[in-house]
From Swiss-Prot:
Cofactor field: Ni cation
Any one Gene Ontology BP term: urea catabolic process
The family this protein is said to belong to: Belongs to the metallo-dependent hydrolases superfamily. Urease alpha subunit family.
Species of provenance: Synechococcus sp. (strain JA-3-3Ab) (Cyanobacteria bacterium Yellowstone A-Prime)
Lineage: Bacteria, Bacillati, Cyanobacteriota, Cyanophyceae, Synechococcales
Keyword match Protease: no
Protein's name in the database: Urease subunit alpha
Gene, per the UniProt record: ureC
Gene3D superfamilies linked to this entry: Metal-dependent hydrolases (3.20.20.140), Urease, subunit C, domain 1 (2.30.40.10)
Length: 569
């Protein structure tokens, strides 16, 4: 019996050469390899299907190596490629990608994917599997942020804060050991991975060291606490000693120096620059220059992404609220206005498309939207293809390289930058199975299924009193991985290695504690598919942006995909 490509795609999902449009964007994904081949013995669950006893299900017990979960026939999209594969999970970690089934009667079954009676199945055919998103610029203002992020496909959040205090609404810091401990305790009840940044603003090391020893995974320098060269040098010196990252919001007012002085204070040491365009804060008007330095790992925050006809209008009020400014004080208004430049906003989109800005983050409730990191990343990719055409690495058939570049901005690159890439950030054996399944029509905007360590944590679910799962009202709802002791088994807390070794953490934490590592000595070249180092200049009078001597800009978008069409109900 022979199947047409169309019939095979309907039954088993796309294979090599099949192409998928991502939601209502202009982005086309093409399957590059099919690891479930040869055809004819696909693992498919359901009535009359193959995953049955003696067929694609073997007699292997868990003790004999059968996986706990197999996701079948998914299109795996990650920074490293686009493949059709079955994915196996055991003990919460990915064990293999390849062909699942029963090796007693099937050829080519991948070791680790031998389906047994103890194996659960999630059907991935016709769906796209990506790593869970990682948002590393979180103001922990409200615990409800976690649900908004989770329901958008984010599974890891790092940042700082203590709730809706003035300090937290403006800065991404959890200051001092007492608050770090209380926040570590509070975050135990939310079903995502978390890590906390301590306050990095000090000219002497002792107060910074005690925060790292209390569990902080890094330090945040913020201009509202004083981002002076002395502060920068001290924070980076401490970070080098303890192998943690430093994130910085630089000095918008140029009070203690200009961008050149800040770059000099880095002394070539690795640092993560938040909202590198500057509307979120940073040396006016030319903080954007930092994206051309090899020791700088730059990110954007999502309110400026992508640049639209509405971007300018909303920023002034946002800024006044977030930074405790008064519209009645002329100096406060001037401070706010100095950060809002359409020219640098327009250039930011292009710098992302060139791979010069490596990460995308939210800046949650502090000039950013926690549930829109993924959505705005793909809106930007769409806008750039619309304006700039295919990337040189792509063809007229697909946008695979551009898609992988943009995916890396909220998955593997923030994981690398903050020392958690050995645990999360990509779909590779050995990493935790923090995964998101998407129907192509809803890709990037509404996930189909979110897993934490291989356990379903969230999904659109119909009326719980209905006879089947699908009747309206269909809403995002937490699933079993979000409850009871299971939550603490499949969601992890990142802490410093020093805190684990020296016993500086609060007693009674129930979650698995994982140390951050390998944050120092990173360079832009470690940012997957986003390692460009252009020379960037900003004209101090006109704010025009030059990249390697050529002016770059983009038009404000009037219409975007992944917008009202998906939020009518």
């Amino acid at each position: 019996m022979r199947l047409s490509r169309e019939a095979r795609a309907r039954l088993y999902g796309p294979t090599v050469g099949d192409r998928i449009r991502l939601a209502d964007t202009n982005l086309i994904l093409e399957v590059e390899e099919d690891w479930t081949l040869p055809p004819g013995e696909e693992a498919v669950f359901g009535g009359g299907k193959t995953v049955r006893d003696g067929m694609a299900q073997s007699q292997r017990s868990r003790s004999e190596g059968a996986p706990d979960l197999v996701i079948t026939n998914a299109v795996v999209l990650d920074w490293w490629g686009v493949v059709k594969a079955d994915v196996g999970v055991r003990d919460g970690r990915i064990v293999a990608l390849g062909k699942a089934g029963n090796p007693d009667i099937m050829d080519g079954v991948t070791p680790g994917l031998e389906i047994g009676p103890g194996t659960e199945v999630i059907s991935g055919q016709g769906r796209i599997l990506t790593p869970g998103g990682i948002d590393v610029h979180i103001h922990f203002i409200a615990p409800q942020q976690a649900w908004e992020a989770l329901f958008s496909g984010i599974t890891t959040m790092t940042g700082g804060g203590t709730g809706p205090s003035e300090g937290t609404k403006a800065t991404t810091c959890t200051p001092g050991p007492w608050y770090i401990h209380r926040m570590l305790e509070a975050l135990e009840g939310l079903p995502l991975n978390f890590g906390l940044l301590g306050k990095g603003n000090a000219s002497s090391p002792q107060a910074l060291e005690e925060q790292i020893l209390a569990g902080a995974i890094g330090l945040k320098i913020h201009e509202d606490w004083g981002a002076t060269p002395a502060v920068i040098d001290t924070a980076l010196t401490v970070a080098e000693a303890y192998d943690v990252q430093v994130a910085i919001h630089t000095d918008t007012l140029n009070e203690s120096g200009f961008v050149e002085d800040t770059l000099a204070a880095f002394k070539g040491r690795t640092i993560h620059t938040f909202h590198s365009e500057g509307a979120g804060g940073g040396h006016a008007p030319d903080i954007l220059r930092v994206v051309g330095y090899p020791n700088v790992l730059p990110s954007s925050t999502n309110p400026t992404m992508p640049y639209t006809v509405n971007t300018l209008d909303e920023h002034l009020d946002m800024l006044m609220v977030c930074h405790h400014l008064s519209p009645n004080i002329p100096e406060d208004v001037a401070f706010a206005e100095s950060r809002i430049r359409p020219e640098t906003m327009a250039a930011e989109d292009v710098l992302h498309d060139l791979g010069a800005i490596s990460m995308m983050t939210s800046d949650s409730q502090a000039m950013g939207r926690v549930g829109e990191v993924i959505l705005r990343t793909w809106q930007t990719a769409h806008k750039m293809k619309e304006e700039r055409g295919p990337l040189p690495q792509d063809s007229t058939r697909n946008d695979n390289f551009r898609i992988r570049r943009y995916l890396a901005k909220y998955t593997i690159n923030p994981a690398i930058a903050h020392g958690i890439a050995e645990y999360v950030g990509s779909i590779e054996p050995g990493k935790y199975a923090d995964l998101v399944l998407w129907h192509p029509a809803f890709f990037g905007v509404k996930p189909d299924l979110v897993l934490k360590a291989g356990f379903i944590v969230a999904t659109p679910m119909g009326d719980p009193n209905a006879s089947i799962p699908t009747p309206e009202p269909v809403r995002y709802r937490p699933m079993f991985a979000a409850f009871g002791k299971a939550l603490t088994r499949v969601s992890f807390t990142f802490v410093s290695q020093a805190a684990l070794e020296r016993g500086g953490l609060p007693a009674g934490l129930n979650r698995t504690l994982l140390p951050v590592r390998k944050t120092r000595g990173l360079t832009k070249k470690d940012m997957r598919l986003n390692d460009a180092l252009p020379q960037v200049e900003v004209d101090p009078e006109t704010y025009r942006v030059l990249v390697d001597g050529e002016e770059i800009t983009s038009e404000p978008a009037k219409i975007l995909p992944l917008a009202q069409r998906y939020f009518l109900f």
